[in-house]
Amino acid sequence: MTQKTLTKLAIEVLTTADGRAKTALSHQHAATWFAARKTGEPLAIGQASPPLRPSRPEKPDLLDPRNVPKRKPGSPAGRIALLHAVAHIELNAVDLHWDIIARFGHIPMPLGFYDDWVKSADEESKHFNLVCDCLESLGSYYGDLPAHAGMWRAAEDTAEDILGRLAVVPMVLEARGLDVTPGMIDVFKKAGATQAVDALNVIYAEEVGHVAFGSKWFNFLCGRDNLDPKDVFHKLVRKYFHGPLKPPFNEEKRAEAGLPPDFYWPLTESGNV
């Protein structure tokens, strides 16, 4: 029997629709990758043709961002809506991390690149399940509310540009999570929702690493091609990200993840010239 390549394992995750099943397979394939790494005989990376969009469950209904109902997070329904939005983000993140492996397998990269994104996909799978557990404890579930249809747009826009993918997904979208998660934690603390607080604290701590992986491999690729990382980052974010970056920024956590202020402040409305 021919051993499966890492890119084929990635596609198995991408083509699994149900969220719980997708994340279970993600955990399984991450364990397979790291077990092989420990033996000193890693799986072949291989090359594959991932789908433009990953398989998704029938629910939630995906709406234009402007049509997703706004709910105040101070109410129980608002807190459920906030958790539902986080679950949707985490499920997309699982697919985004497996997609970067599958889509760019033709680009020679050190094995550490795959270690980092498999680890990230594994952690995002855990995050999705933690948040789903919170939703279920509140009498809801993932799919019970409509969700944002634009989450995969960044992946489609950067499907042929690995530097663009690294710039927009971990270094912009996931970095935004570092800015907003402390406020979400406060919302659930005030409500005495300890399960949600615990889940969000896990997410907050581990997302720093995902942003750092993006920054690390973005800088690696720029260095390999003798490019200036800051200039390339500004160019690619202006090309692929729709609109200015929005402060306030969590400068401490961004710095921890290898993102200096001169990367993101020039891309705000006041600095975007």
In which residue ranges do the predicted regions lie?
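Non-heme di-metal
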Residues: 1-273
